[in-house]
Amino acid sequence: MNTFSQVWVFSDTPSRLPELMNGAQALANQINTFVLNDADGAQAIQLGANHVWKLNGKPDDRMIEDYAGVMADTIRQHGADGLVLLPNTRRGKLLAAKLGYRLKAAVSNDASTVSVQDGKATVKHMVYGGLAIGEERIATPYAVLTISSGTFDAAQPDASRTGETHTVEWQAPAVAITRTATQARQSNSVDLDKARLVVSVGRGIGSKENIALAEQLCKAIGAELACSRPVAENEKWMEHERYVGISNLMLKPELYLAVGISGQIQHMVGANASQTIFAINKDKNAPIFQYADYGIVGDAVKILPALTAALAR
């Protein structure tokens, strides 16, 4: 048996749902999708869900992951085994841990390949900071996986599809985190997973102010702007959602233009599936040139304006 009888899908990030649903179609005979509202439920059915389970009734001061108890109960009530697919977001991983505990299931994070053999999931993901690929065969009846971005192609919606909708009512867990305040995230919404052209900046750009040079290039060629982890996590020059690497975005654009990025393996595992890699770096020995199809050795601050002017003609 090379498929599960049932798969359960949930995504806290709407843009990740289509790829999870495509993976679900390949891995199981029946697709169940947990959603938070009616609009997400309608989308899930168009993407292939046979059953939609609307999570309902959570108080405003409680966290989404507090639904883990009723989600696990619902999963157990509809089969003695199954596969759970979640995005490898922070919330996805937290929810995976809670579901794993309640389902007595093995949990595997950041899966880049998933297959089913004899009714059991086999998972591959990066280990040792991206230096190797590890393979795990999950022996527990339930398997809970968080999936790396780009592991599956996005499913295409079909408005003619039909499915059943159910409601799962909130039940307060015995121990829970209460949210006391919410601060709006200062971020420009962008779906880098779908970008054809990506310009990505590293610390070699020199300063936060110099990122404007990369933004001008993006505008000239219709690209999206990304960055390396140090730019987002250490320097705080850009949003966390834009950094490319093993623990975040795994991109497959037609063009990946790396500006001032050294090319460490932890970054490149998120970019080396690009059709073409173009690197700009003032260090001729930078590892990025081992991956690049094309490269320029020089100061990005001087090269970017000239490149933008040439491509804008």
From Swiss-Prot:
Pathway: Amine and polyamine metabolism; carnitine metabolism. It comes from the Bacteria. PROSITE patterns: ETF_ALPHA. Disulfide bonds: none annotated. The keyword Electron transport applies. GO terms for biological process: carnitine catabolic process; carnitine metabolic process; fatty acid beta-oxidation using acyl-CoA dehydrogenase. It holds the Pfam family ETF_alpha. SMART domains: ETF (SM00893). FAD binds at residues 255-283. SUPFAM superfamilies: Adenine nucleotide alpha hydrolases-like, DHS-like NAD/FAD-binding domain. One of its GO terms (molecular function) is flavin adenine dinucleotide binding. Keywords: Electron transport, FAD, Flavoprotein, Transport. Transmembrane segments: none annotated. PANTHER family: ELECTRON TRANSFER FLAVOPROTEIN ALPHA, PROTEIN FIXB-RELATED. Required for anaerobic carnitine reduction. May bring reductant to CaiA. Heterodimer of FixA and FixB. Belongs to the ETF alpha-subunit/FixB family. This is Protein FixB.
